[in-house]
């Protein structure tokens, strides 16, 4: 029996203002949610907290993986940097810090961090979500 291995990806990225270099929440800039991703060529996009998340279709080869990554990223670039009079840019930093006043103004649901549910591999008990 042949086993076929596929590879995918689901990275998160942040959005910044090109004028102030401050982070901007993706929650009202792109479609899709964790529960209802917005399907695009090569995968899907969705909001994950304040970040923009994308995932790609399972890929059987390096070229298919890179092609799917390019297609979905191109879609995100068009939605973020191609709109809003190009005042926003995609930021691949691993973390984002928001101005306190701006963060306080965001809806409560975009401030929730972590996976639902998240379990401790050793105790098999559910972890408490991190605080913001």
Task: Go through each PLM region and give its residues.
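Phosphate/nucleotide-binding catalytic core
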Residues: 1-132
């Amino acid at each position: 029996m042949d086993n076929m291995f596929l590879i995918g990806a689901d990275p998160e990225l942040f959005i910044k203002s090109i004028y102030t270099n401050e982070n901007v929440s993706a929650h009202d800039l792109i479609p899709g949610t964790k529960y209802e991703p917005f399907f695009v060529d090569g995968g899907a996009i969705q909001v994950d907290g304040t970040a923009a998340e994308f995932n790609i279709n399972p890929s059987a080869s390096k070229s298919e993986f890179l092609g799917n990554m390019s297609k979905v990223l191109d879609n995100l670039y068009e939605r973020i940097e191609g709109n809003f009079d190009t005042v926003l840019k995609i930021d691949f930093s691993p973390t984002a810090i928001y101005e306190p006043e701006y963060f306080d103004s965001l809806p409560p649901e975009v401030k929730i961090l972590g996976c639902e549910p998240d379990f401790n591999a050793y105790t098999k008990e559910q972890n408490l979500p991190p605080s913001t």
